[in-house]
Design a protein with these regions (language model features):
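Repeated scaffold domains used in trafficking and secretory/extracellular systems
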Residues: 2-13, 36-53, 79-93, 119-132
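Short loop/turn segments that connect beta-strands within the blades of beta-propeller domains
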Residues: 20, 52-53, 60-62, 92, ...
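Aromatic (tryptophan-biased) beta-strands that constitute blades/sheets of beta-rich domains
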Residues: 22-42, 73-80, 112-124, 153-154
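Extracellular-facing segments of soluble proteins and assemblies that are Gly/Ser/Thr-biased and enriched
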Residues: 49-78
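WD40 beta-propeller blade core
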Residues: 65, 105-106, 143
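Short loop/turn segments that connect beta-strands within beta-propeller blades
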Residues: 69-71, 108-112, 146-149
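Acidic, small-residue rich beta-repeat scaffolds with periodic aromatic anchors
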Residues: 125-154
Length: 154
């Protein structure tokens, strides 16, 4: 019971309470904490633990957050121009993959964008399969990307 509440809404808007809001609460061995998020679109927050970096990576609306897993303190916040579709975390990668409708981002633990790829079709599905990031477009096309480099995978 208890724990710190961090409101990250002001990072998104000067009036975050006018937007869609969600709270993410973590109860763990290191204690409890809660973050309050804001989005211009209706979404449900999803998260994955990036254990090698000690971050809980959260996607909500247009934003991805790298939060300290034990405290919820933001390490980085990344905004996309289009809604986020998925995120992928692996101890085999030096970055987290953030998939938006029109772009793929590789974001390092300090929030630096390692690489970015723009897509010509809206991405409707993304899966990490056989060490390839497989993207499905609105038009039905499928594209495979090397998740480490962002280059086309054969």
């Amino acid at each position: 019971m208890g724990g710190e509440l961090r409101d990250l809404g002001p990072e998104v808007s000067t009036d975050p309470d006018a937007l869609c809001r969600a709270e993410l609460r973590i109860d763990g061995p290191g204690g409890a904490w809660t973050v309050r998020l804001a989005s211009t679109i209706n979404d449900e927050p999803t998260a994955q633990l990036w254990d090698t970096e000690g971050q809980l990576v959260v996607k909500y609306g247009f934003h991805a957050y790298g939060l300290a897993a034990r405290t919820g303190a933001p390490a980085w916040i990344h905004r996309s121009a289009t809604p986020l579709v998925a995120l992928f975390v692996s101890s085999r990668l030096r970055h987290v993959l953030v998939q938006a409708e029109l772009e793929t981002f590789a974001i390092e633990a300090d929030g630096t964008v390692a690489w970015r790829i723009a897509h010509s079709d809206v991405v409707t599905g993304a899966n990490l399969v056989g060490w390839r990031l497989v993207l499905t477009g609105y038009g039905g096309g499928v594209n495979a990307i090397d998740p480490a480099t962002g280059r086309a995978a054969g």
